[in-house]
């Protein structure tokens, strides 16, 4: 195992736990998100990077795995979390909105929010370079 290689992998740290992340930093990547994936490692996720804070709303259309959706403001403080967002394969999928302006959105496997014991104000560390 290459420790130096792991250090260079894009990752985030939340409540002391490290998650390797895919980066959604374009509209196309954000629209695709985690659609059509059948599984995701327990220490993996996806980070959505937006140019500024705004009210965010995600849906689970064509997403095959349940997720926790974490919304962070421009200071990387947790604004809100939608726990256990369910997969949706129909036309009318539920939306999961932030409760306040968010600039960063993190998707992890469902159950991580409860496992980590996250609370509003928790800080996300970004290591994307």
Language-model region placement:
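Bacterial N-terminal signal peptides
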Residues: 1-3
């Amino acid at each position: 195992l290459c420790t130096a290689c792991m250090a260079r992998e894009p990752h985030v740290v939340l409540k002391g736990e490290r998650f390797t992340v895919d980066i959604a930093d374009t509209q196309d990547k954000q629209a695709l998100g985690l659609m059509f994936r059948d599984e995701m490692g327990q220490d993996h996720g996806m980070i959505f990077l937006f140019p500024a804070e705004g009210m965010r709303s995600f849906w689970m259309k064509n997403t095959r795995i349940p997720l926790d959706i974490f919304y962070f403001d421009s200071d990387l403080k947790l604004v809100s979390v939608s726990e256990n967002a369910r997969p949706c394969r129909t036309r009318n999928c539920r939306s999961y909105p932030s409760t306040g302006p968010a600039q960063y959105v993190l998707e992890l496997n469902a159950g991580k929010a409860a496992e980590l014991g996250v609370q509003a104000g928790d800080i996300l560390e970004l290591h994307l370079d």
